[in-house]
A protein has these predicted regions:
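Short, charged, amphipathic alpha-helix that recurs within catalytic cores of restriction-modification
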Residues: 67-87
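Acidic-basic catalytic patches of nuclease active cores, encompassing PD-(D/E)XK
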Residues: 1-31
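Conserved catalytic cores of phosphodiester-cleaving nucleases, focusing on short active-site segments
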Residues: 40-63, 68, 76
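Active-site metal-binding core of divalent-cation-utilizing nuclease and nuclease-like domains
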Residues: 23-50
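Structural motif
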Residues: 37, 50-52, 93, 107
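Residues forming the ATP-binding cleft of Hanks-type serine/threonine protein kinase domains
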Residues: 33, 56, 113-114
Length: 117
C-alpha cells in the first residue's frame, strides 16, 4: 500500500469513526489536530466528557488486535494534554479512546484505554 493510499484509507476511516461517534451522541469538535507532541485523529464531546480518539483501520479483523501500541497511545495522550487547554470547559473530564475498523465489521470503540505510562 502506497503512502498516498494509506493516507486516503486513514481519512476514510476517520470519517466512518466520526459518523459512528455522532450516532452514539458525541459531537465532533476536532479532526486531525496536530500538536508538537503528535496528532489526534478525532476529538469528540458528549456532555462534560472530551474524548481524544485514535482511529485505526486494518485489512482484517485479526490485524486489529495488534493495531495499537503503548508508544502510539503515549503520543496521543501527550497531544491531548496540549489540546485540553484550548478545548476544555470548567468541570470537563478527558479520556483517550480508540476506534478500530476492519472490512465487514462494525466499528469497535474502546473507551478510556490510556492510564499513563
Amino acid at each position: 500500500v502506497s503512502r498516498q493510499q494509506a493516507e486516503k484509507r486513514g481519512r476514510q476511516a476517520e470519517r466512518i469513526a466520526a459518523w459512528w461517534l455522532r450516532l452514539k451522541g458525541w459531537q465532533i469538535v476536532g479532526r486531525r489536530m496536530r500538536t508538537p507532541a503528535g496528532e489526534v485523529d478525532l476529538v469528540a464531546r458528549r456532555g462534560s466528557m472530551l474524548a481524544f480518539v485514535e482511529v485505526k483501520v486494518r485489512g482484517s479483523a485479526a490485524e486489529l488486535d495488534i493495531a495499537i501500541d503503548e508508544r502510539r497511545l503515549a503520543r496521543v495522550a501527550a497531544a491531548a494534554e496540549i489540546l485540553w487547554h484550548d478545548l476544555a470547559k470548567a468541570g470537563d473530564d478527558m479520556r483517550i479512546d480508540v476506534i478500530l475498523l476492519a472490512p465487514g465489521r462494525a466499528p469497535r470503540h474502546l473507551a478510556n484505554v490510556w492510564h499513563g505510562g
